[in-house]
Amino acid sequence: MALDLAGHGFDVAVHYRGSAEEAQATAQDCADLGARTQTFQTDLSDEAAARALLPTVVQAFGRVDAVVNNASDFEYDNPASFSYALMERQWRANTAPAIVLAQALHEQVTARGATGCVVNLLDQKLWNQNPDYLSHTLSKAALEAATTMLAMGLAPAVRVCGVAPGVTLLSGAMADGEFERAHRMTPLRRSSTPEDIARAVRFLIESPAITGTTLLVDGGQHLAGQPRDVMFLARQNAQEM
């Protein structure tokens, strides 16, 4: 997403929590594409730090026009193993910071008489539910609801939209072969790629008449009615072959 935006004329602030080398490499790639770029380290689960992030970026860049909320924690649980502790970690990583950053963008663009856009990265699983990754899914469901409510409450200065990817990158304990099988378990026989997601994010940022809605970019995975997380289904299919 950062590279796509940088390649289409956007300057890019790259946030990271602990992956400094990866963030610096991404920033360098953005700079090579002609973008002004800088990295910013913040633990978004800390409310004070999350609230300080956007003003810090504004101080460095002069203004912010869009926020892409892609930071996410991804820990496994299910209805039998649910705990307050994990749910709180998921909420503090996946939901609350996105709301705080939308607030901050609204304050910043309103102060200068401008407009802005927030894009929240969600999950096709919200439209294709199963009991795996319960707390993660609940945190993303809350963010999807917040996307609509923020769009209503922050208009007309800020538009708020969502993008719901499918199987896009290796995650958790998924092996390469499982990822390839999972990626094909959609009506289109392909799920989303990073490039697909980046184009969708940029489309929303550049579309001034769109707010309060989510684009599902998943090869139709949300139509498949899968009873388990696709990682487990791909593993099961491999065992049956």
Can you describe what each PLM-predicted range is?
Residues 1-13:
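Canonical Rossmann dinucleotide-binding motif of NAD(H)/NADP(H)-dependent dehydrogenases/reductases
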Residues 73, 110-155, 167-168:
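Catalytic loop of short-chain dehydrogenase/reductase
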Residues 73, 80-99, 119, 136-143, ...:
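Catalytic Tyr-X3-Lys loop
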Residues 5, 63-64, 144, 154-168, ...:
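Conserved Rossmann-fold SDR core element
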Residues 194-217, 222-223:
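C-terminal substrate-recognition "lid" of short-chain dehydrogenase/reductases
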Residues 20, 41-53, 81-84, 195-196:
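The beta1-alpha1 cofactor-binding region of Rossmann-like NAD(H)/NADP(H)-dependent oxidoreductases
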